[in-house]
């Protein structure tokens, strides 16, 4: 007589216990868990039971559904965002989560499409809906003026998106930058002149001619020439351009922790300098750096008489 094998069915697990265990796992791994992690932790639970529990948690707004290079991720939902996304479907929640993860640098719709694997028409519909709810906003990037990046509505865009103080409506404020250049250099020149007039020994004169970036920043703020609030980082950017022009030199010294203008126990000091050798006229003229110099000749398609760079240089 043949032996009869009887398949023993595991006892049905309580759905609430499964959901609670998944929530516990999500708290253990705040960056998200995969289905494989859930399966490893609960090997006796069948795939269908896991799917039912996960879908229920998603529908109740307790989990966020994310996509990564390794596949789908389940992450515990932020309690603050749970109320905002009430009534939204899973696709809308997914797009919102992708935008949230992008932070204040934002994300293009093309990248949202890649991460969500949703059709572009569906993404555009979701984006308009989220914008109408004031959950997200579209911001034009200075890196690509015809493209918009999306970020959460309450975020201040990163400097890499707006261009910082040097841009207004995606236009580079060259005149404003030039004025700041002149004023920063003037301040350092006056500092150096005061040091020379002190008639002290050369070493003391040299040390007295230096100014910290905080001093320069304070001077510019007191002048009131900027309509936007400038940071020390903005002023250091201007000072760096003066260094590249050979008008200023920088040194870094050790500073006591907490000293105004110091960062991580170091302080940047700047002073105005005179060029050792005056630059030649060829370096100043656009011809010295022109990439089509070899093709330029009178009567040709490229010639000095119709050169826009030469015209601008002569007018300047």
Swiss-Prot record:
Q: Which family does it belong to?
A: Belongs to the eukaryotic RPC34/RPC39 RNA polymerase subunit family.
- One GO term (biological process): positive regulation of interferon-beta production
Q: Which UniProt keywords apply?
A: Acetylation, Antiviral defense, DNA-directed RNA polymerase, Immunity, Innate immunity, Iron, Iron-sulfur, Isopeptide bond, Metal-binding, Nucleus, Transcription, Ubl conjugation
Q: Which residues carry this modification: N-acetylalanine?
A: 2
This protein's domain notes: The [4FE-4S] cluster-binding domain adopts a globular structure that serves as an interaction hub that connects the POLR3C/RPC3-POLR3F/RPC6-POLR3G/RPC7 heterotrimer to the Pol III core.
Complex formation: Component of the RNA polymerase III complex consisting of 17 subunits: a ten-subunit horseshoe-shaped catalytic core composed of POLR3A/RPC1, POLR3B/RPC2, POLR1C/RPAC1, POLR1D/RPAC2, POLR3K/RPC10, POLR2E/RPABC1, POLR2F/RPABC2, POLR2H/RPABC3, POLR2K/RPABC4 and POLR2L/RPABC5; a mobile stalk composed of two subunits POLR3H/RPC8 and CRCP/RPC9, protruding from the core and functioning primarily in transcription initiation; and additional subunits homologous to general transcription factors of the RNA polymerase II machinery, POLR3C/RPC3-POLR3F/RPC6-POLR3G/RPC7 heterotrimer required for transcription initiation and POLR3D/RPC4-POLR3E/RPC5 heterodimer involved in both transcription initiation and termination.
- Listed SUPFAM superfamilies: Winged helix' DNA-binding domain
| Principal localisation | nucleus
Where is this chain's protein located in or outside the cell?
Nucleus
Binding annotation for [4Fe-4S] cluster? 287, 290, 296, 307
Q: What InterPro entries is this protein classified in?
A: RNA_pol_Rpc34, RNA_pol_Rpc34-like, WH-like_DNA-bd_sf, WH_DNA-bd_sf
Role of this protein: DNA-dependent RNA polymerase catalyzes the transcription of DNA into RNA using the four ribonucleoside triphosphates as substrates. Specific peripheric component of RNA polymerase III (Pol III) which synthesizes small non-coding RNAs including 5S rRNA, snRNAs, tRNAs and miRNAs from at least 500 distinct genomic loci. Part of POLR3C/RPC3-POLR3F/RPC6-POLR3G/RPC7 heterotrimer that coordinates the dynamics of Pol III stalk and clamp modules during the transition from apo to elongation state.
Keyword Ubl conjugation listed: yes
Molecular function GO terms recorded: double-stranded DNA binding; iron-sulfur cluster binding; metal ion binding
Task: Tell me a GO cellular component.
Answer: RNA polymerase III complex
User: Gene behind this chain?
Assistant: POLR3F
Enter cross-link residues for Glycyl lysine isopeptide (Lys-Gly) (interchain with G-Cter in SUMO2). 5, 7
Top-level lineage group: Eukaryota
Protein name (record): DNA-directed RNA polymerase III subunit RPC6
- Whether Oxidoreductase counts among this entry's keywords is no
